[in-house]
């Protein structure tokens, strides 16, 4: 149990670190851009892009910054917001997409995330055009009570620019 929870939290931390790698480039955050490279396709939306909503434990989250969607090698990487407060998800490129991992960042002192195969939490995804709905239960550790895992329901609705 402790090992699986540690793996889940480590996965969330890795995802959070990955967001910082995706957040470079458009520092002003005021213009939308689209680019492609040899490893896949990257799509960016301007801050406050329509269609983005994140809910954790029934509460809307204030997530600001760009939406970056990258499709490479059969995997969709979605990053919302900046490195410090961002949300990230990794999905398969199938229909329906399978959730590989989700990083929700720090919510009220608890770093929340989901990683498939750990036995901790759950997540499903659906796709409608360029819009994704990712929902489930993320897990984390409250450092005030590290022996008691924290589970929070979440839902992410995001649209990737075509």
Curated annotation (Swiss-Prot):
Modified by Lgt on Cys-22 with an S-linked diacylglycerol with a mixture of C16, C18 and C19 fatty acids, signal peptide is removed by LspA, modifed by Lnt with an amide-linked mixture of C16 and C19 fatty acids. PROSITE patterns: PROKAR_LIPOPROTEIN. A lipid is attached at residue 22 (S-diacylglycerol cysteine). GO terms for cellular component: plasma membrane. Residues 28-42 have a biased composition (Low complexity). It is a lipid-anchor. InterPro entries: LpqH. It comes from the Bacteria. A lipid is attached at residue 22 (N-palmitoyl cysteine). It is found in: Cell membrane. Keywords: Cell membrane, Lipoprotein, Membrane, Palmitate, Signal, Transport, Virulence. Residues 24-53 are annotated as: Disordered. Residues 1-21 form the signal peptide. Might be involved in ligand transport. A host TLR2 agonist, modifies host gene expression in response to pathogen. Belongs to the mycobacterial 19 kDa antigen family. Forms a U-shaped beta-half-barrel with a large hydrophobic cavity. This is Lipoprotein LpqH. It comes from Mycobacterium intracellulare. The gene is lpqH.
């Amino acid at each position: 149990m402790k090992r699986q929870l540690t793996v889940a939290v480590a996965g969330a931390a890795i995802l959070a670190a990955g967001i910082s790698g995706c957040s470079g480039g458009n520092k002003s955050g005021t213009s939308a851009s689209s680019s492609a490279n040899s490893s896949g396709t990257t799509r960016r939306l301007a801050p406050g892009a329509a269609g983005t909503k994140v809910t954790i434990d029934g509460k809307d989250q204030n997530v600001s910054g760009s939406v970056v969607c990258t499709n490479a090698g059969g995997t969709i990487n979605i990053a919302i917001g900046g490195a410090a407060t961002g949300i990230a998800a990794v999905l398969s490129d199938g229909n329906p997409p399978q959730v590989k991992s989700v990083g929700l960042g720090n919510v009220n002192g608890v770093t929340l995330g989901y990683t498939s195969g750990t036995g901790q939490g759950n997540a499903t995804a659906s796709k409608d055009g360029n819009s994704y709905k990712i929902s489930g239960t993320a897990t984390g550790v409250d450092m005030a009570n590290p022996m008691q895992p924290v589970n929070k329901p979440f839902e992410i609705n995001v649209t990737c620019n075509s």
